[in-house]
Amino acid sequence: MAADLAAMRVDYGGVPSGSGEDVDLDEAWLAGGWEPLLRNWIEQATAVDIAEPNAMVLATVAVVDGVPRPASRTVLCKGLSPEGVTFYTNYDSAKGTQLAAVPYAAATFVWPVLGRQVHLRGPVERTSAEQTAVYWRSRPRDSQLGAWASQQSRPIDSRAALDRALAEVTARFAGVDEIPVPPHWGGYLLRPEQVEFWQGRRGRLHNRLLVRVAGERMTVERLQP
């Protein structure tokens, strides 16, 4: 039997699993800024064993024949600070090329089990080489080799060809204790101008708080669902 997509729905409400908090998202929760609350929600998602609680959908702008088109994919947030969220990738990938042309993006964290999501939007800039190097050294060796082997987002003839590229890179760095950072690889920092916290509620009357960030100044307003 085919799935009835129109009938699929979840009745939000009550205390989110593992949160131990009132479900009613309150402006007071943002007294310390947007970053502590986002960090807290990621930690709560971790506590209830959500897979990759730091995953976020990154949306960029692809300019095709002079026309802007949306593009999105899931990446992992690898850094969180009052300045913004950090992620790493191949600078020559589709998203890297798009960010070079239009250095602005949106990122959305979604935790359905908790009935929560957070949406950030703002300009994007590359992280420093020093910051990239620190994170690179924390990556598993297999991931480092993969970053050298893959020309991300470009066509390849077969899986076998990709495996051969990995074998060549593995041989190249055999005996090398610290694999260097590829010149085409590094981090990005998304500096949010807006951060929206969303909490599901019964009857689809969800809680939405929008944080606007302008330098040291922050304002919070409640949005209708």
From Swiss-Prot:
InterPro entries, alphabetized: Pyridox_Oxase (IPR000659), Pyridox_Oxase_CS (IPR019740), Pyridox_Oxase_N (IPR011576), Pyridoxamine_oxidase_dimer_C (IPR019576), Split_barrel_FMN-bd (IPR012349)
Amino-acid positions noted as binding substrate in the UniProt annotation, renumbered to this chain: R9, V10, D11, Y12, K78, Y135, R139, S143, R204, L205, H206
Cofactor note (record): Binds 1 FMN per subunit.
Cofactor: FMN
Gene3D superfamilies (UniProt xref): Electron Transport, Fmn-binding Protein, Chain A
EC class name: oxidoreductase
Residues bound to FMN: R73, T74, V75, L76, C77, K78, Y88, T89, K95, Q117, Q152, S153, W198, R208
Statement: the UniProt record of this protein carries the keyword Transmembrane helix: no
A Gene Ontology BP annotation from the UniProt entry: pyridoxine biosynthetic process
Alphabetized GO MF terms: FMN binding; pyridoxamine phosphate oxidase activity
Keywords: Flavoprotein, FMN, Oxidoreductase, Pyridoxine biosynthesis
EC number per UniProt: 1.4.3.5
Pfam families, A to Z: PNP_phzG_C, PNPOx_N
Pathway: Cofactor metabolism; pyridoxal 5'-phosphate salvage; pyridoxal 5'-phosphate from pyridoxamine 5'-phosphate: step 1/1; Cofactor metabolism; pyridoxal 5'-phosphate salvage; pyridoxal 5'-phosphate from pyridoxine 5'-phosphate: step 1/1
PROSITE patterns: PYRIDOX_OXIDASE
Complex formation: Homodimer.
Summary of the function given for this chain in its UniProt record: Catalyzes the oxidation of either pyridoxine 5'-phosphate (PNP) or pyridoxamine 5'-phosphate (PMP) into pyridoxal 5'-phosphate (PLP).
PANTHER family: PYRIDOXINE-5'-PHOSPHATE OXIDASE, PYRIDOXINE-5-PHOSPHATE OXIDASE
Family, per entry: Belongs to the pyridoxamine 5'-phosphate oxidase family.
NCBIfam families tied to this protein: pdxH, PRK05679.1
Protein name in UniProt: Pyridoxine/pyridoxamine 5'-phosphate oxidase
Gene: pdxH
